[in-house]
Regions:
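Alpha-helical cap/lid subdomain in secreted, periplasmic
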Residues: 1-134, 187-209
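Glycan-recognition and processing domains
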Residues: 130-200
Length: 209
């Protein structure tokens, strides 16, 4: 919900529904739960009793597929309203016994924010554990344009000029492009601005990395 805070509503809905449908196509016995964290720009809406926009769009998907969700804002707001919590603190300051939830307005602190999230999630999981085990049958899509068929394709499968060099997985540059997910199967390198890759596709969205 935080990372999608300003994302287009349909992109959010298409992405979330695509994830759900991909998971249940692969294994209908997989249980899914949506988790909604929060950051400082959401506070005005939350204090007014409204879910933030990204949460509202994700909830349309959760409701349609009967997926449980956990909103971490509730316990945070309760402490904030009781003046027991500082949402964005300064690590160099003391706050007379109050819980410092974040130091940057987004990421919960280890000593203050994480225990609140842990309490919220633990309570919610105990509640969800009462539900009956069952397979999840896929029904007609809520959004026909969802990203259920989205996939990653190695760049080597596209037409490209001969100047590109396929990097070894032992190459440091290869590792630098992987990130935490280790998602890229191949990485090509070129120092010639005339080298090219041609991508032809049929669909509504394409990304090249």
């Amino acid at each position: 919900a935080v990372n999608d805070a300003k994302t287009d509503s349909l992109v959010i809905a298409h992405s979330m529904e695509g994830i759900v449908r991909k998971i249940w196509h692969h294994n209908p016995h997989t249980d899914i739960c949506f988790l909604y964290t929060l950051n400082e720009p959401m506070l005005d809406d939350l204090k007014a009793g409204k879910n933030y926009r990204s949460v509202r769009y994700m909830e349309t998907v959760a409701d349609y597929y009967d997926i449980p969700s956990v909103n971490f804002a509730d316990d945070v707001l309760e402490l904030l309203n009781e003046d027991k919590l500082v949402f964005k603190g300064d690590s160099k300051k003391e706050y007379s016994g109050k819980i410092v939830f974040t130091n940057d307005g987004t990421h919960p602190t280890y000593d203050g924010g994480h225990p609140i999230y842990t309490k919220t999630l633990s309570r919610s999981l105990l509640q969800m554990n009462k539900a009956q085990e069952k397979a999840h049958a896929l029904k007609a899509p809520l959004y026909p344009g969802n990203y259920e068929k989205a996939k990653m394709i190695p760049v080597t499968e596209f037409e490209h000029s001969e100047g590109w060099k396929l990097l070894s997985k032992d190459d440091k540059a290869f590792s630098n492009f992987q990130g935490d997910q280790k998602a890229l199967p191949v990485v090509l390198e070129s120092s010639d601005s005339e080298d090219f890759v041609k991508v032809h596709f049929k669909g509504i969205r394409v990304g090249v990395f």
